[in-house]
Amino acid sequence: MALTIPRSQYVATYGPTVGDKVRLGDTDLWATIEQDFLTKGDECKFGGGKSVRDGMAQSSTATRDNPNVLDFALTNVMIIDAKLGIIKADIGIRDGRIVGIGQAGNPDTMDNVTPNMIIGASTEVHNGAHLIATAGGIDTHIHWICPQQAQHAIENGITTMIGGGSGPADGTHATTCTPGKFNIERMFQACEALPVNIGFFGKGNCSMLEPLKEQVVAGALGLKIHEDWGATPAVIDAALKVADEMDVQVAIHTDTLNESGFLEDTMKAINGRVIHTFHTEGAGGGHAPDIIKAAMYPNVLPASTNPTRPFTVNTIDEHLDMLMVCHHLDKRVPEDVAFADSRIRPETIAAEDILHDMGVFSIMSSDSQAMGRVGEVVTRTWQTADKMKAQRGALGDEGNDNFRIKRYIAKYTINPAIAHGISQYVGSLEVGKLADIVLWKPQFFGVKPEFVMKKGFISFAKMGDPNASIPTPQPVFYRPMFGANAKANTESAVYFVSQASVDANIKAQYGIQKETLAVKGCRDVGKKDLVHNNATPEITVDPERYEVRVDGEHITCEPATKVPLAQRYFLF
């Protein structure tokens, strides 16, 4: 006999279901669950008097030798994912990978259990009924100035960091390049203790091919071209030739000073080949004043860095000082001041907000310690989404913000993964991918996760006083968990590298323990492949007033005076 209970009681017990709306943090973004994979009456819930017990939702007979038995079951959780949508399900994990999105439990006593999601005596369980699960974020603009960045990144839900550098040298302060085999090898060895997946860019600034190829063989997952090393047409062509031959991506910070040509010359040198453009608005660097036009090309994968996200009343003043420090400029030199002024344009920064909302800009990243904040990629993304809803209204007429939410979460999950050939491993919660999962309470969404899993094992979490009688007493702050300790850490994170370096067995050469996974398909992608963010309208920029037009229409917006996910959540 079926038992009917009020919706409010169901939600209180098992979390929201189809049609329920959930507010994300203190934003005005509302997510509505589109599909529920769970069977009503057969939900799995752990605890005293609950269903995950021997002979009930837990199998009495299934051993781990059975490949359908889970290592970890995350039950009744709301999922927000660029590929899966906004759904309710159990997540099944085995051997560090997601093996099922569906109904976990005991098929001997329950209906509709997903075949490979059996809960047994070897299964850990976590109640996700009032939590949101997202894929671990991917930051593709890391200046490896200090190793402590990794902890700040994972505390905001970033689990993969791609960039370059070798510590606080001037070259790393300004450019995301790890130059040459010696530095690449040392960085792999140095990052063994970091709890995140990592990939390194080699220095792409060379007009001859062999010095570039040797860096890819040494383990670089891609090449980075930066104007401070000279972003000339010859350099661009050489880097792309190597990338095409060795299946890696090229990222570029173009020529702000237009020393060796203008945007049109850079696009001619690129010659239709796929490329990932950093801070495509231009405040972080790039052809002044019209680098933003690069976002209209089908072979360009355009990204933002977070200091301009979103456009606020403080954005312009902050950028001038940041720029002088990061690019080794001198306020006493008029040419240096003019260089800085040419990059900071309110008109193009305002347009950047709208281009993100239109799905023209596709990727968010940090520019860590080099005009960007490594621990704010996720937060700044949702602040931008909220600002655009306030200024531009709803996207579509669904009565919720689901499409906008999926568009924005794609910017720091699946789209950077596609851009760098790692979407078969990370970027979404699809079956078969690494179980890099971030769990949020809805009221803290986008700001402070509850905990972060790496390859199916809890790596970082909000944790109270370790000497307390329960886990929750103050002071509560982020602490590394067992997944970030000792050998578990090297088993829970990976290095993304070139196939050439896997073939060269750099893991043995360098004596590193983390798994090395080869990037694939970097040269076969285009803007059309980027999820929910693949628009290619015509973009023009007035060279004197810097006004940006999209298909002939002037786009602009006012700077925000207040943003969500800000001082309400932080003491400082």
Curated annotation (Swiss-Prot):
The modification N6-carboxylysine is found at K224. Ni(2+) 1 binds at H141, H143, K224, D367. GO terms for cellular component: cytoplasm. GO terms for biological process: urea catabolic process. It catalyses: urea + 2 H2O + H(+) = hydrogencarbonate + 2 NH4(+). Carboxylation allows a single lysine to coordinate two nickel ions. The active site is at H327 (proton donor). Keywords: Cytoplasm, Hydrolase, Metal-binding, Nickel. Its cofactor is Ni cation. It is found in: Cytoplasm. The keyword rRNA-binding does not apply. It holds the Pfam family Urease_alpha. Binds 2 nickel ions per subunit. It is an enzyme of class 3 (hydrolase). It comes from the Bacteria. GO terms for molecular function: nickel cation binding; urease activity. PROSITE patterns: UREASE_1, UREASE_2, UREASE_3. HAMAP family: Urease_alpha. Belongs to the metallo-dependent hydrolases superfamily. Urease alpha subunit family. PANTHER family: UREASE (PTHR43440:SF1). Heterotrimer of UreA (gamma), UreB (beta) and UreC (alpha) subunits. Three heterotrimers associate to form the active enzyme. This is Urease subunit alpha. It comes from Actinobacillus pleuropneumoniae serotype 7 (strain AP76). The gene is ureC.
